[in-house]
Each structure stands twice: as C-alpha cells, then as structure tokens.
Amino acid sequence: MALPEFTMRQLLEAGVHFGHQSHRWNPKMADYIFGARNNIHIIDLAQTVPLLHTALQAVSDTVAKGGRILFVGTKRQAQDNVADAAKRCAQYFVNSRWLGGTLTNWKTISASIKRLRHLDEVLSSGEANSYTKKERLTLQRERDKLDRSLGGIKDMGGLPDMIFVIDTNKEDIAIQEAQRLNIPVAAIVDTNCDPKGITYVVPGNDDAGRAISLYCDLIARAAIDGISRAQGELGIDIGASAAPLEEELPAATAASTFQGLPGPRGTADDLKKLTGVSGAIEKKLNDLGIFHFWQLAELDHDTAHQIGEEVGLPSRADAWVAQAKSLADA
C-alpha cells in the first residue's frame, strides 16, 4: 500500500472548490479563498491539495503507530459516508448526534457502552424470552437509541488518537473536547468556518455529497496504508531478528518480537473458528495482541510456532495460519 493519490481535477469534479455565499463567509478563511463568482466564494485548491496530503499523511502515521482514528460527521449527507469509510478501514465513527462528553467524560460514555453491550447480549440470546413482549420492545428501543449514538465507538476501547471532522461548525463541541484533551483534529473547513484550533486544516466544500464521499474515501485509504505499514514493519523486524534469536535466546523470549495490537481494530474476529481454539486459548491470543485473522495470516512459520508455544498448542500453529488466510479472505 501507499498513501492515496488524488488530483486537482478530482477535487474540481467533486465540487470541493465551491464555498458558501460570499456574505456568509468567515473572515478567518480569507487566506484560503481564491475569489468570488456569482456571489459564491471559490476555495483556492492550490492550497487544498498540499494541505489534504498533509492530513492524509498524519492519518497514516497515526494508524501506523497503533493509533485510533475517529470519523465525525453527523449531518445527513455525511452520515453514510462516514460510517462506511470508518468500517472499511477498521476505525471508529460518530454519525448521529454527538453526545456532550463523548471524549471529556469517557468514563460515563464507557458505562453507556457497557449497557449497550449488555442489551446486545440479552436481545441476541435466549434470555430475551424471559421478558414480556412489552419489556423486550422497551429494551430494543433502548438498545437502538444507544447504538445510534455509540455503535460506532463501542469497540474503540479508549480515547482516539486523532479525529477527522466533516463540518466544523456543526461538530464544534467534538472539536472543543478534542482540543481540551490535546487530540489532533483533521477537518474539512468551508468558507463559513473558523480554522482556529484545527491541527490539519483542509479547505473545502463540506456540503456536497460527492466531495464528502471523496474526503472519506481518501482518509479511509490513508488509514489502510497505515495498517499496511505497521504490518510491513512487523515483518521486517521479525525477519531481521530471526537468526540471532534462534542462536542466543530461548524460543519463549523470541516470541516477544511479535508486536500485537493494543486492542481490536473495529470488531474482533471470532478466533474460536480456528481448529483447537477454545475460549481460553482465544483469551491467550488476545493477551498477545492477536484479535484478527489477518494478523495470523501474515505470520511466518517460526513466529507462528513461537506464538503456538506461548498459548500451549505449538503443533496447531501452521494450521491456524492456513485457516486464518482463508477466513481473512472470506
């Protein structure tokens, strides 16, 4: 993978250069405005191109270091694009109403997420049959309400390392919370917005559906590039250290060169689908930082065997890698 490429022509075709009516402008955006035509401000794409590239690089670098990206876009025309892009790159999103304190009061939000998980378990199991129809309906409504607000972050496991925002005016509370916590903000900033406090300003139309789709696609691809880079670096480290580790260190220590993830990227895969993996073995794999089939699929023979020894089933390791490749591609 490589950082996603784009052209000024793509930005033009998506309508990125169209700002708001000139009387609705924010003077702080003057440096990013090329001029006005028919009472509509035109954004200077000669500045947008390098600034967007900088934002994409920041996203890729953040993910490559194991960081989390939170997509934020609650306006109607952004909701689907934000959710789809975040899911595609195994990141997180808020596309319904932003709950005050989502970042600054994470402890309370975590309690709500715990409640959402509990409701999911109750409604998807036989336990739901012990409730009356009215009680089940009440629980379902509560679950749906929580899922709209928290469904995109229920697997985040902690504060994000960067947020990407569509429409800084509408998402001003999210931006203020990120600023208070020193979380970098990459944002699409239209001519009626205030760029102050935005870490990575990307001047552009924040209303056009095609423009929003383009932004989200590029950010998602940048995040995927970061994941690819992280895995590539992992492979290089293992290859470079394999020979000396075999000579100088016991096998159990060699397994420590595997750099697992701090938490699942999105929803963790069901590792119990692998032959011989019980709930207890799955937990051991999780403790080693393995949550997804693609992580196992990319292991070489020696590293897979070392991890197999760590969980007590070294003879299964090669089979797990083969199975994981099939399951990851499914």
From Swiss-Prot:
Gene Ontology CC: cytosolic small ribosomal subunit
Gene Ontology BP term (one): translation
Membrane keyword on record: no
Superkingdom of this protein's organism: Bacteria
Keywords: Ribonucleoprotein, Ribosomal protein
InterPro entries found in the cross-reference section: Ribosomal_uS2, Ribosomal_uS2_bac/mit/plastid, Ribosomal_uS2_CS, Ribosomal_uS2_flav_dom_sf
A Pfam family: Ribosomal_S2
Gene3D superfamilies per the UniProt record, alphabetical: Glucose-6-phosphate isomerase like protein, domain 1, Helix hairpin bin
GO molecular function ontology, one term from the record: structural constituent of ribosome
Record flagged with keyword Nucleotidyltransferase: no
Family affiliation: Belongs to the universal ribosomal protein uS2 family.
Protein name in UniProt: Small ribosomal subunit protein uS2
Gene encoding the protein: rpsB
